[in-house]
Each structure stands twice: as structure tokens, then as C-alpha cells.
Swiss-Prot record:
Active site residues according to the UniProt entry: C156
Extent of the signal sequence: none
Protein name listed in UniProt: Type II methyltransferase M.BspRI
Single biological process term from Gene Ontology: DNA restriction-modification system
Keywords: DNA-binding, Methylation, Methyltransferase, Restriction system, S-adenosyl-L-methionine, Transferase
UniProt modification remark: In the absence of DNA, can self-methylate two cysteine residues.
Species per Swiss-Prot/TrEMBL record: Lysinibacillus sphaericus
NCBIfam families named in the record: dcm
Enzyme class, first EC level, given as a word: transferase
Pfam (any one): DNA_methylase
Residue positions, PTM S-methylcysteine: C181
Length: 424
């Protein structure tokens, strides 16, 4: 099977040549070597003294942390492990109550890294103040803090089915630095998240190589496609969850059992009505403006009794609010609003935050630049929310790890704070 490879020329994309599947591995190896050579010239700018470890917790290192959806879900699962589900979920509704007990979680995040300023501003507003927040390109980070658990959703535009899918898109190789972190830190467990499209890029060869590369770092690796709506998220959102357990650790990770669905014995799917129905009178700010021909080429509006379309990292691409008449298909690639465009709007920031299962108290930064348009500032919030892992999906993924962590800490209680390890 031939695979498209990106070729740049004069600032534009030339027609892509084709490579056979056996050539993909060689291409990946070349890219890995390029990335490793680049990091060799980096300098360290953090010290172990700046990292606030806890010897009685499972210390967590977060890569590509974004606004903190994955981190918050893990913290919540760790709190449920310590205090019970009812108490943790009740506290989760209120910022002050949650902040007062969040330190009880078995997970303790010590470090978070990203390059997007607004996302890190959001992270700092909402996550514990002991976390060392590192705004730096991961390709220029020479050494990472020690941790028991490394988590992260490495950037995925190059894998996305929503746009061009080119094997050598440079964004496809940031996972190498996740693996570099694993080789240096050697955490007991890691969890990586990515889009569904990574499984089929290059006929599946790229995905197979990525899983193999993670395993080569010293881990037993599993990967599975999960749908967020199966775990109480009011949204159809499929994501690949890759979990690795260090080869010497006696733990077999179990993917979460489905909790929501139409089958007997499961809770019903959470609907848009349940998630955002109470916000109709006070939805908060939302992205305004016309709809493109591409946007109107398919249905963008769900019923109140449905789950949302996947929330995208764009205000302009936000789904339409479920109120009013449904959209109508009038041609092969053309849908309309039968009662007029003025009677419909995109989902608001507050609404998509709910759909991504963030609590209402979670504040998203818009960058604070009053010189740009309202839409521009709102789009920064939409982007953060759309890029995030739904909190309740992260919570489901984390539950069995939280149980393992609690048992592991009882049996392997460290007496000294871990030290940073330099990767050579």
C-alpha cells in the first residue's frame, strides 16, 4: 500500500510522492535521529529543588498538559480512591470544597509542561499551586523531573482525520520526546492519549511503530480506542488510550468497563439536555459569525436527547446549540437552517466546558488581550477546551491505576524524595 509523504517546496505543498509501507519505518527512524540530535544541544533550566515531591503519593509528571483535563481526571480518580466516589464527586462541584480536600488524592502532580501560554494560564488558575509549570518546547527540554506516573496527550494535528494526514508532518514526531522522558525518568506507569486517526495513518504502520517504540523504552504496552460517551461524557468522542507498565512492575492494567449505554445493566448515556439544559437562559459568551460552505456541508446540530458531536479546538467549528428546529438536508453536501440562520447559534464556552465534563468553577483564560476581537479571545478558550481530554474519560482511565498506586505506596513507601535523572 502506498503512503503519502509530505514534501514542502517554496512555502507550499507539492504533490506528495508515495512510499511503500516498509519505507515508513526508515522514515520514522530518520526523524527520531533528527529529534534526538536537536535535543542534545538543549540546556537544563530546572533543578530538583524546585520540584515538590511527596513521598507518600504517586508523583505525576504531565507532558503536553494543555488546560489540564487529563490531569484533573486523574486527580479526581485518586481522590475517589482515598475518600470514596460519593464524597469526591460531591466536592468536585464546588471549587472551595474541592480545593480543601484535593490533596487527599493518591496522585500528586509535580510538573506540567506545554508551550501554549493561555492553556498554562488556565492550568495555573485551577490546578494546585505546588505544580511546577514549565512553559517550554519539549524538544528543548534536556531533563525531566522524576515521577511514578507520566501522562500526556501528545499533539495530534498530523494524525487528525479532519485535515491533511501526512506521514512526516513534524507534529507526528513529538511522541519521541514522550518516550525520551520515559527513558530518562523510568516511571512505573505511563498513559498517553491521541486521536482515532493515528491508528490508520499510513495503513496503520505508523501506529504500530509508535506502540513498538513505547515498548522499547522498557514497558509492556497496550492501546485501545475508547468512546468518551461510554463513561458519562455527553459527547461522541473516540480517543486512543495507550498505557504502559514498566517491565519489572507486577501490575496488569485493566481498561475501564463501560458504564453508560443502551444495554441492560448500564446507566443511560448522558444527554445534552442533562448536561446543558439549565444553561439556556444564561449560556455565557459564544462564537459568532457566518457559517462556511464546508461547515454547512453536513448536519451540525444534535437533538436534546442525543450526545454532542466531538468538540473541536475551534470556536468557528463549534456544534450548533440543540434548541429550535433541526437542520435540513437540501442537497448532497448542503444543509440549511429551515427557520433562518438568525435563530441558531454555536454552543457557548460554558456549554462546551460542561460537555467536556469540566466543573463549572474551572476558569479558562482568554489571554486577556483586549486589543483583539471578542471572537479571537473566545477562540482561545474553545481551543483549550476542544484539545482537552474529557475529565470523566480521564477519570475512568485512571481508576485502576489509582487502586494500584494506593497498594503500591503501602508496599513501597519511599523514605527520600526522588532525584532528577539526566538522560544521556
Amino acid at each position: 500500500m502506498a503512503i503519502k509523504i509530505n514534501e514542502k517546496g517554496r512555502g507550499k505543498f507539492k504533490p506528495a510522492p508515495t512510499y511503500e509501507k516498509e519505507e515508513v519505518r526508515q522514515l520514522l527512524m530518520e526523524k527520531i535521529n533528527e529529534e534526538m540530535e536537536a535535543v542534545a544541544t538543549a540546556t537544563s533550566d530546572i533543578s530538583n529543588d524546585e520540584i515538590q515531591y511527596k513521598s507518600d503519593k504517586f508523583n505525576v509528571l504531565s507532558l503536553f498538559c494543555g488546560a489540564g483535563g487529563l490531569d484533573l481526571g486523574f486527580e479526581l480518580a485518586g481522590l475517589e480512591q482515598s475518600l470514596g466516589t460519593d464524597k469526591a464527586l460531591e466536592a468536585f462541584k464546588d471549587r472551595d470544597v474541592y480545593n480543601a480536600i484535593r490533596h487527599e488524592s493518591v496522585f500528586h502532580t509535580v510538573y506540567a509542561n506545554d508551550i501554549f501560554s493561555e492553556a498554562l494560564q488556565t492550568y495555573e488558575k485551577n490546578m494546585p499551586n505546588h505544580v511546577f509549570i514549565h512553559e517550554k518546547d519539549i524538544r528543548k527540554i534536556k531533563e525531566f523531573p522524576s515521577a511514578n506516573l507520566v501522562i500526556g496527550g501528545f499533539p495530534c494535528p498530523g494524525f487528525s482525520e479532519a485535515g491533511p494526514r501526512l506521514v512526516d508532518d513534524e507534529r507526528n514526531f513529538l511522541y519521541i520526546h514522550f518516550i525520551r522522558c520515559l527513558m530518562q525518568v523510568q516511571p512505573e506507569i505511563f498513559v498517553a492519549e491521541n486521536v482515532k486517526g493515528m491508528m490508520t495513518l499510513g495503513g496503520g504502520e505508523v501506529f504500530r511503530q509508535i506502540v513498538e517504540d513505547f515498548g522499547a523504552a522498557g514497558y509492556r504496552v497496550e492501546a485501545r480506542l475508547l468512546n468518551a460517551r461510554d463513561y458519562g461524557v455527553p459527547q461522541i468522542r473516540e480517543r486512543v488510550i495507550i498505557v504502559g507498565v514498566r517491565n519489572d512492575i507486577d501490575f496488569n492494567y485493566e481498561y475501564p468497563e463501560i458504564t453508560h449505554g443502551n444495554e441492560e445493566g448500564l446507566k443511560p448515556y448522558v444527554t445534552l439536555e442533562e448536561a446543558i439544559g439549565d444553561l439556556s437562559l444564561d449560556p455565557g459568551p459564544y462564537f459568532t459569525g457566518s457559517y462556511s460552505t464546508i461547515f454547512m456541508s453536513r448536519n451540525r446540530k444534535k437533538k436534546w436527547t442525543d450526545q454532542s458531536f466531538t468538540i473541536q479546538a475551534s470556536g468557528r467549528q463549534a456544534p450548533i446549540h440543540p434548541g429550535g428546529l433541526p437542520m435540513e438536508k437540501v442537497d448532497k453536501n448542503k444543509w440549511i437552517f429551515p427557520d433562518g440562520e438568525e435563530n441558531h447559534r454555536r454552543l457557548s464556552v460554558k456549554e462546551i466546558k460542561r460537555i467536556q465534563t469540566f466543573p463549572d468553577w474551572y476558569e479558562f483564560s482568554d489571554g486577556g488581550n483586549m486589543k483583539v476581537s471578542v471572537n479571537n479571545r473566545l477562540d482561545k478558550q474553545y481551543k483549550q477546551i476542544g484539545n482537552a481530554v474529557p475529565v470523566f474519560l480521564a477519570r475512568a482511565v485512571a481508576k485502576s491505576i489509582a487502586q494500584f498506586a494506593a497498594d503500591y505506596l503501602k508496599d513501597n513507601h519511599p523514605h527520600e524524595a526522588p532525584q532528577m535523572k539526566l538522560f544521556i
